[in-house]
Amino acid sequence: IKIISSLFDKILSSSNEISAAAYIPDEPKNKKYDFNKSKVFKFNDLDREGSFLAFRIEGDQISIKERLNDISKELNLSKLKTSKLDFFQSVPFWKKINNLELFANTKNNVLRAIVPPAKCFKIMNLLKNKFKYFIDWSGSLFWIEVPDKEDIKISEIKDFIVKNNGFVTIVKKSENFDFVEKIFTSDETKLLISKKIKESFDPVSLFNPGRMYREI
C-alpha cells in the first residue's frame, strides 16, 4: 500500500504530463466476487497474476521516449517488474478501465468514491484485500464493489470516506440494496467537491477529462 501511494504521489508531482494512472489490486478471496481480472486485462505483456499500477503518456514517439526515460528515473522503475504496452494494447486497456469492465457482470453494489490525493493511503488501508476495487485519477477516484446484502459495509465505507473529506455515490445497486441516505445522490455540492479535488492535483485536466462528469 505504501509503495502504491508513494508512486501515485510521484506521478502527480511529475512534470512529464502523465495523462492517466490507475491501480488494480489483487482480487479478494471471496466467492461473492467474480474473479475476472486476469481475463479482463489479458494482454501480451500483462498475462500474469498479481496487482499492478498502470500509467499513460501520450504524444509523438520522440517525446514519449524522452519522458518515459525521465519517469523511469522518477519512479525508480528499474527496481520494479514492468511492461510497456504498444498503442494497440494501450487503447483497449484504458477503454476497459474507463468502462469499468471489472464490474461488468456483477450483481453486487458498485460505489464511486472521490477523495483528496493525500487520503489515498488511508482509503487503501481501509479496503485492503477485503473488497474488489480499483483506483483511478492517480489515487483520488475509487471504484469499489460491495457484495449484496452487506449494506452495513457500505455505510462503514461511506462514513470513513466522508470523515476523510471525500464523498461516495452508488453507481450500481444490487437486487437487495436497501440504503436510503441522500449521500448516494449526485448534486451540485458533490460536483463542486469533485471539481475542487481534481483541480488540486490536475489543474490543466490531463487526467481523463470527462471521466466523472462532462465538466471534469
Functional labels for PLM-detected ranges:
Residues 1-106:
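C-terminal substrate-binding/cap subdomain adjacent to the FAD-binding core in PCMH-type
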Residues 77-216:
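Conserved glycine-rich FAD pyrophosphate-binding loop
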